């Protein structure tokens, strides 16, 4: 049995300290709790939950079909089994960035990144992506 010793706040502080160190962080992706535990045992600095991998694991293409519930549930499963900070790709913020951030804070997530694409985003590797304006993205960030 794997017992986590660090709470969410400690994990967030760890990530903040690591980012301030200006060192390159090795942050491999985990698609389930077992993968996260392996990442920790190998000695990486954090765990990353990819939106594309999450979509594919659920049987969807990476075009914005996952829900806040889908991603937060799996991310919580991953974060609770490791002492490492977990960073999650929250696509375009699932309609309400403020609600998304609150949800992921409750899930024990250390950080998220939010896409700057229009709704019904597309995988970053695909053509024909449309970005929102710089002003809208700044507003998105300010609102959270």
Name each region found by the language model.
Residues 10-13, 60-88, 107, 125-144:
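Alpha-helix-loop-beta-strand connector modules within alpha/beta enzyme cores
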Residues 33-53, 108:
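Catalytic domains of carbohydrate-active enzymes, especially glycoside hydrolases
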Residues 1-29, 33, 37-41, 143:
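N-terminal amphipathic alpha-helix/helix-capping segment at the start of soluble metabolic enzymes
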Residues 26-32, 47-49, 86-90, 112-114:
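Hydrophobic faces of well-ordered beta-strands that scaffold small-molecule active sites
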């Amino acid at each position: 049995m794997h017992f986590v010793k660090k709470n969410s706040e400690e994990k967030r502080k760890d990530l903040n300290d690591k980012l301030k160190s200006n060192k390159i962080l090795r942050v491999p992706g985990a698609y389930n709790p077992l993968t996260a535990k392996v990442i920790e045992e190998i000695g990486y600095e954090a765990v990353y939950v990819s939106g594309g991998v999450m979509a594919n694991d659920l049987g969807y293409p990476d075009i914005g079909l996952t829900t806040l519930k889908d991603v937060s549930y799996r991310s919580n499963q991953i974060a609770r089994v490791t002492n490492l900070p977990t960073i999650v790709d929250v696509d375009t913020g699932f309609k309400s960035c403020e609600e998304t951030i609150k949800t992921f804070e409750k899930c024990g997530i250390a950080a998220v990144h939010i896409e700057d694409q229009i709704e019904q985003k597309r995988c970053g590797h695909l053509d024909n992506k449309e970005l929102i304006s710089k002003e809208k993205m700044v507003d998105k960030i300010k609102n959270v």
